[in-house]
From Swiss-Prot:
Protein name per its UniProtKB record: 5'-deoxynucleotidase HDDC2
UniProt modified residues of type Phosphoserine: 3, 5, 204
Keyword flag Phosphoprotein: yes
Organism: Homo sapiens
Top class in the EC scheme: hydrolase
HD domain location: 46-148
Modified residues (N-acetylalanine): 2
The enzyme's E.C. designation: 3.1.3.89
Residues binding a divalent metal cation 2: 81, 86-87
Protein family according to the UniProt entry: Belongs to the HDDC2 family.
Domain of life of the organism encoding this protein: Eukaryota
Catalyzed reactions per annotation: a 2'-deoxyribonucleoside 5'-phosphate + H2O = a 2'-deoxyribonucleoside + phosphate
Length: 204
């Protein structure tokens, strides 16, 4: 697999790279739809979500995995959303149609890159979509874990413990990586404490 650092750009190639960077830069301005639908103020962007996922891929221990590949998967897995937007379950778009739109978007995005990078980024996206490797399965759990961590943070910021329970419900039973299970357990314990404390406070 070619390394991203191996590519060189000049002339027309540099213009295409600039176009690619502007395109993926739109992810900074694509809000995560689930938060929008729940009326979260100043919801995070898709880029925000993928950044913390990439950090999680770096720091959550698993010597059996290719961690460099995990980071790359985290950075690419939602890249198509710079064109198609963040399609949420509440949008009621069939999974096959969502995949078709994102596949077309990834082909459009990667067309701006040299052949080796085009192949690498598209194959990373496809690997995540098909969950065809241990690394892809790990990153999928990071995706879910990052989401509920963000939900907890929004509850804290709003001083409304438990308001985003449906995000937790949607991930029930989906974690099996030992380190992620431990992290989720700690998060849920903290959150349960906050919910209990809020329930015991006298209401004015």
């Amino acid at each position: 697999m070619a390394s991203v650092s191996s590519a060189t750009f000049s002339g027309h190639g540099a213009r295409s790279l600039l176009q690619f960077l502007r395109l993926v830069g739109q992810l900074k301005r694509v809000p995560r739809t689930g938060w929008v639908y729940r009326n979260v103020q100043r919801p995070e962007s898709v880029s925000d979500h993928m950044y913390r996922m990439a950090v999680m891929a770096m720091v959550i221990k698993d010597d059996r995995l290719n961690k460099d590949r995990c980071v790359r998967l985290a950075l690419v897995h939602d890249m198509a959303e710079c064109i198609v937007g963040d399609i949420a379950p509440a949008d009621n778009i069939p999974k096959e149609e969502k995949h078709r739109r994102e596949e077309e978007a990834m082909k459009q995005i990667t067309q701006l890159l040299p052949e080796d990078l085009r192949k690498e980024l598209y194959e990373l996206w496809e690997e995540y979509e098909t969950q065809s490797s241990a690394e892809a399965k790990f990153v999928k759990q990071l995706d879910q874990c990052e989401m509920i961590l963000q939900a907890s943070e929004y509850e804290d910021l709003e001083h409304k413990p438990g308001r985003l329970q449906d995000f937790y419900d949607s991930t029930a039973g989906k974690f099996n990586h030992p380190e992620i299970v431990q992290l989720v357990s700690e998060l849920e314990a903290e959150r349960s404490t906050n919910i209990a404390a809020a329930a015991s406070e006298p209401h004015s």
